[in-house]
């Protein structure tokens, strides 16, 4: 279905997390036709647009942590301009600053339209084979080991899937915490999802992960199947 230009809308547009083929036709249509694209990094977004043949102007919202760009953007939206919000990769608002713009727009009466697509979170869930309800998403874990531990301790109270992102240089400090807090929990690791060196590896428990660590390069997402043994591997009763 072709994009129909409408005034005063903010489109929240997912972009690829690695494989350019994951951009949707609708996303391309929207990004070509809006008046302005709001982004994290102008450099990253312009690089994507060059590959897609998109010439729409871009504005980096968060470079100076100022509220001034937000005020200017809101004024233009209220005047009838249409805009799209993108992140550097994946779905805006999922472990990036995008939710701030969406919340501000909603508080000011701006209509918001999702244009869904790639996400490392849903990509790993889709290949897990685990019952996905409930899923507790932590985003990126904290930098400090003590705070990281507290976050995982709170998550341990949930019986279900626990999903989080982790930076490559923090992996050695992560493994001992997982071994202590989740000694019998299944682990699914996704590395460089949708990219050339993509890996999805299953570990029976965190000790197996620590003894056979993945290549310490790239971007990582982890899934812990933290539930009773009798529930592990069950299929969902609903599908969306």
Curated annotation (Swiss-Prot):
Family recorded in the similarity comment: Belongs to the methyltransferase superfamily. RsmI family.
Pfam families: TP_methylase
Entry keyword Methyltransferase: yes
Segments crossing the lipid bilayer: none
Record-level GO cellular component terms: cytoplasm
Subcellular location: Cytoplasm
Entry-linked PROSITE patterns: RSMI
Function: Catalyzes the 2'-O-methylation of the ribose of cytidine 1402 (C1402) in 16S rRNA.
One annotated GO molecular function: rRNA (cytosine-2'-O-)-methyltransferase activity
Keywords: Cytoplasm, Methyltransferase, rRNA processing, S-adenosyl-L-methionine, Transferase
EC number(s) reported in the record: 2.1.1.198
Organism in which the protein naturally occurs: Leptospira biflexa serovar Patoc (strain Patoc 1 / ATCC 23582 / Paris)
InterPro entries in alphabetical order: 4pyrrol_Mease, 4pyrrol_Methylase_sf, 4pyrrole_Mease_sub1, 4pyrrole_Mease_sub2, rRNA_ssu_MeTfrase_I, SAM_MeTrfase_RsmI_CS
Gene: rsmI
Name of this protein: Ribosomal RNA small subunit methyltransferase I
Reactions catalysed: cytidine(1402) in 16S rRNA + S-adenosyl-L-methionine = 2'-O-methylcytidine(1402) in 16S rRNA + S-adenosyl-L-homocysteine + H(+)
